[in-house]
Structure formats: structure tokens, C-alpha cells
Amino acid sequence: IERFAKVAHKNHLPLFVDNTFPSPVNCRPIEWGADVVLHSTSKYLDGHAMSLGGCIVDSGNFDWTKSPRHTDMCAPDESYHGLVYTEKFGKAAFIAKARAQMMRDIGMAMSPMNAFLLNVGIETLHLRMPVHCSNALAVAEFLLSNPKVAWVEYPGLKNNRYHALAGKYMPDGTCGVISFGIKGGSTRTK
């Protein structure tokens, strides 16, 4: 993550990271240089697939005045009486604009019931994620030993090409998502 952050920041661009699968329990991208972290809350954060939602976490570390692609942060917003987000909110300009202008224009407000359900899920996230990870590792190891399986992708496996990176960024576990292929392809699955 920090290599991407270095390149992005050298070019005065923010680094956005989708942290839906590992969740904040297993990976904290801001600690590695990400400026904005995104989550689909209807996955692990929710915990019971009862509500749709998303989450933006702004680190407050990015200087939006230096970004050549985000000039709207530095220009007057006529829909808010000429408000200039970078002048009023500094490094929190992005999240302020997302809350004020984007939420108003697109309607990204979660219903109270969905917010309640999300909160219930978040309360147990730290308990559920280790179990998701250990279960996924067990399934990945089983699939790896199955003669009908051509390949298995799961960064928790020691022989996975991303295992070292997963250990660095997600030392407490990766996630519960596994991908694999059947020998013989789609014709064998019918």
C-alpha cells in the first residue's frame, strides 16, 4: 500500500483503498499511507446481510489544494453560497464535500433501521473476523488437497504469491473470500 501511496502522493493524488474484505479488524490502510478508505458495509461490517450501505473514512492527511484533478475542492461551490471546501475545512475538505454536497445531490443517507442493523453487526465484528479467516483457511486447504481442483487463491495459504504481503498488511488474518478453479473448467461443473 505504501508504494502506491508514494506514487500517488508524488503526483499530488489521493490514494483510495477499498477495505471491504479485510475490514478494519484485519487491515488499517491509513496506517500504510491511504488517504481515503472505503467499505461496503453490507458485507462483513453488517454481519447479517440485512442492510445495504457504504462507508467513507477520510484520514484527513491529504492536501487537496495540491491535487490537479480535484480543483472543485478549491473552487467556490455556488450551491453553498460560494463555500470553498479547502479554505473552510482544510484537509477534511473531501469528507465535508461528500457529506454536504454529494449526500444532498445523490441521497446517500442510511435509514435509521439500516444504521441500527449496521451498528449491531459492527459490535461483533472483532469476534467474527477471526472465525471467518480460520474457516476460509480450512476450506482453502481442503480445496488445495482436492484432486478435482485446479487452483486455489487465498492469501492466507503459505504457498500463495501474496502470502507475505497479506502477513504484512493483515497480520491477524485476511478475510473469508476464496477463489478456485475446477479441473476441466466449466464443462466439468455441469
Regions found by a protein language model. Give the residues of each.
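Conserved PLP-enzyme active-site core in the AAT-like
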Residues: 1-145, 153
